[in-house]
A protein has these predicted regions:
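Intracellular juxtamembrane helix-capping segments at the cytosolic ends
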Residues: 111-124, 303-317
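Intrinsic disorder in cytosolic terminal tails and internal cytosolic loops
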Residues: 1-6, 184-194, 374-413
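Helix-loop boundary and gating motifs at the non-cytosolic
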Residues: 4-52, 204, 215-225, 236
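Loop-to-transmembrane helix entry/capping segments in MFS-fold secondary transporters
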Residues: 41-45, 126-136, 233-234, 317-329
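C-terminal membrane-cytosol helix-exit motif in multi-pass small-molecule transporters
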Residues: 151-155, 166-186, 367-378
Length: 413
């Protein structure tokens, strides 16, 4: 078993490397959205949604590759794929080429995140897993926010910004491959079936689905809702930034709570907090002093659902199944993020503009009920008392950029 200092160093390297990935991703999503508008592509929505299609496919297919070749080689392969596709993008300007290349980027990013999350889970002791994932989420959220700042000085028609993104992915690749690390042992078990996961950790599956639903709806539709309410654009921008900052602020405290108490109870309380805040948001005046604190609460409750669900699922599954579990949960969340805007927009069109908030509240109330029943009625299923051993590999760390989803909606409109 590795020394605690070595494990902490590996976790730190993984978090920093993936933060570089998210810094590039945040910059990349906005850059592509703006460039698509400048180039006046025939199908801008298709170009922008290709990332999510690739991400979903990657979430479905990458787990077995990671288990077959090991975490370090898989991380290098996925980061190299993203860097190569990004480098070619400014050289082949056209709708079809960009659809293919953006799908490749999404596939590679899904692989990077599955690799990272399963690696982090294996390195962290079960008693510390919530804290580790909260630090990971803080790093990725902060990097996403900083990525938006890079666009201010970027010449979107030049090749330089794309080279910057390639360099960031390359730096992340170097950090991970050059580190003295012992990644998790590759699994020889058959592919994880969804039936096994849903029977073993049903609350985690429901939670990831609901997290994707409300996350996709929030970042894609809430800006449009605020614009319909005649909210100034500067206030809309501050609202979305406040939501991201709320996600940052909540991560570590919620992670500690989920390590101390039953994660299912924590999920139920987070869901109730989000649902009540979403309903209150509908009736608030549109002054900054009222809606910005509300945005912090919404972002905080929303952004902590996914990491708590992942930690809960890994508590329930054997250590050599964490790669497959991470891949399945990312896919569930990704599908939810695709369906969320579609369902929310349909409700907004059929009923009223406030329907998006009622939809999000209803979705998390389902999770609150399921998690609450599981936490209060049944005994705790967590295996935290079992030692979590770190083993050598046989061969050879959210969700997708929510800010990009918002950009995609505006570009499509």
């Amino acid at each position: 078993m590795q020394q605690p200092g070595s494990i902490r160093a590996q976790i730190g390297t993984l978090v920093f490397a993936t933060s570089l990935i998210q810094l590039a991703n945040g910059f990349f999503g906005t850059l592509v959205s703006l460039r698509v508008a400048v180039e006046a592509f025939e199908a801008p929505g298709l170009v922008l949604s290709a990332y999510f299609a690739g991400f979903t496919l990657g979430s479905l297919r990458c787990s077995r590759l990671i288990e077959r070749i090991g975490h370090i080689r898989a991380y290098a392969a996925f980061a190299g794929l993203v860097a190569a596709a990004t480098a070619v993008l400014p050289l082949l300007v056209g709708s079809l080429a960009w659809v293919v290349l953006r799908a490749m980027v999404g596939f590679g990013c899904a692989g990077i995140f599955v690799t990272t999350e399963s690696w982090l889970s294996a390195k962290a002791l079960p008693s510390d897993r919530g804290r580790v994932f909260s630090i990971y989420m803080v790093g990725t959220f902060l990097a996403l926010a900083l990525g938006q700042l890079l666009i201010a000085r970027a010449d979107i028609k030049a090749i330089g910004p794309f080279n910057t993104i390639v360099a960031l992915f390359a730096l992340a690749l170097i950090l991970v491959t050059a580190a003295r690390a012992e990644p998790p042992r590759a699994s020889t078990e058959p592919a994880l079936r969804y039936g096994v996961l849903t029977r073993t950790a049903p609350i985690a599956v429901v939670g990831c689905a609901m997290s994707g639903l409300i996350g996709g709806a929030f970042y894609a539709l809430v800006p449009a809702w605020m614009q319909d309410q005649d909210t100034p654009r500067a206030t809309i921008a501050l609202f979305m930034l406040a939501a991201v900052l709320g996600g940052l602020v909540f991560q570590i405290p919620v992670g500690r709570l989920s390590d101390r108490f039953d994660r299912r109870i924590v999920l139920a309380l987070l869901s109730l907090g989000f649902a009540s805040t979403a309903v209150v948001m509908v009736f608030l005046p549109r002054s900054r002093s009222m809606i910005l604190p509300t945005a912090v609460l919404l972002g905080g409750f929303m952004s902590t659902l996914y990491p708590v669900c992942v930690a809960h699922a890994h508590d329930r599954m054997p250590a050599d199944r964490v790669v497959a579990v991470s891949g399945r949960l990312i896919l569930v969340s990704g599908l939810g993020s695709v369906l969320g805007p579609l369902i929310g927009a349909s409700l907004m069109a059929r009923f009223e503009i406030d329907g998006v908030f009622y939809f999000m509240a209803a979705a998390v109330l389902v999770l609150a009920f399921v998690a609450g029943v599981g936490g209060f009625i049944t005994s705790s299923p967590m295996h935290r008392e079992v030692p979590f051993e770190i083993l050598m590999p046989q061969a050879g760390p959210l969700a997708h950029d929510p800010l990009e989803a918002s950009e995609q909606t505006h570009a499509a409109q």
